Curated annotation (Swiss-Prot):
Keywords: Amino-acid biosynthesis, Aromatic amino acid biosynthesis, FAD, Flavoprotein, FMN, Lyase, NADP. This is Chorismate synthase. One of its GO terms (cellular component) is cytosol. Pfam families: Chorismate_synt (PF01264). It comes from the Bacteria. Pathway: Metabolic intermediate biosynthesis; chorismate biosynthesis; chorismate from D-erythrose 4-phosphate and phosphoenolpyruvate: step 7/7. The gene is aroC. Its EC number is 4.2.3.5. It comes from Salmonella paratyphi A (strain AKU_12601).
Amino acid sequence: MAGNTIGQLFRVTTFGESHGLALGCIVDGVPPGIPLTEADLQHDLDRRRPGTSRYTTQRREPDQVKILSGVFDGVTTGTSIGLLIENTDQRSQDYSAIKDVFRPGHADYTYEQKYGLRDYRGGGRSSARETAMRVAAGAIAKKYLAEKFGIEIRGCLTQMGDIPLEIKDWRQVELNPFFCPDADKLDALDELMRALKKEGDSIGAKVTVVASGVPAGLGEPVFDRLDADIAHALMSINAVKGVEIGEGFNVVALRGSQNRDEITAQGFQSNHAGGILGGISSGQHIVAHMALKPTSSITVPGRTINRMGEEVEMITKGRHDPCVGIRAVPIAEAMLAIVLMDHLLRHRAQNADVKTEIPRW
């Protein structure tokens, strides 16, 4: 499995399985001298952690991160930072009945086709449990971006099922279990989740992530365009089936006169491009959206096959999220932070001496 690393100068490599002993990651490229403690990482991990509300999986994992290396006397040393989270609440017996059965909509079938075997306990490496380490690594990037450049990264749920959620108040996001920015829709979300639980079904969601304070000039055309790398990072998150930058697919219905972000002496007059032009940041807010499919881990009976190719009917037992989009919010923030930090370091390495007289807003 060769796809465990993301980034060039800021590099994150994760390891571990859903029901293994632990999850871990190695973070390379962190500059020396940055104050860093486990508490700095724990806040976002707690936001992603399972079992924190009745709307998410009831697997109870404390997700306490340990810094194994790369930090001395409370500051980064410039060497590899090793992070570890122990798994403590595995219930592998929940999966014994599907050892020889491929869950529809999951990676069981494709993992076995590729590797000739699979860890059937909670999906093994294909489980979203792996994303805990992305969030830990992303917290390092978020801290660096905020303290050194004033960059703020925020995410929220902007749609669940057929319920659209307007970004009315960012402060609301941390005050409810849905990461919802629209307090008027909380009752509707609660009603939907209760219905799903009763039916044993699940629902999809849309997550929006925004980075403010990003300087103009980040991105490496042509193959490492900033939007291309953001799309790559967000698409690598479990259950994500689509990514949009700025207006995204809405541009299909727009005229050029509507979509172009006109510029005056006061700055850009709109941000349909989502803060990226020609693969390079424009200095505006970077705005990305991702669509997450409804999880296939449901108790509604469905058809599939076993290893012998025989058709069988199955339900998925275990503890699962009825809407995986809820806990995906801090994961999306982490992946955007990882990409932005990598591109900031790359930009400084080649273009640190570049000066222009063009206005910046």
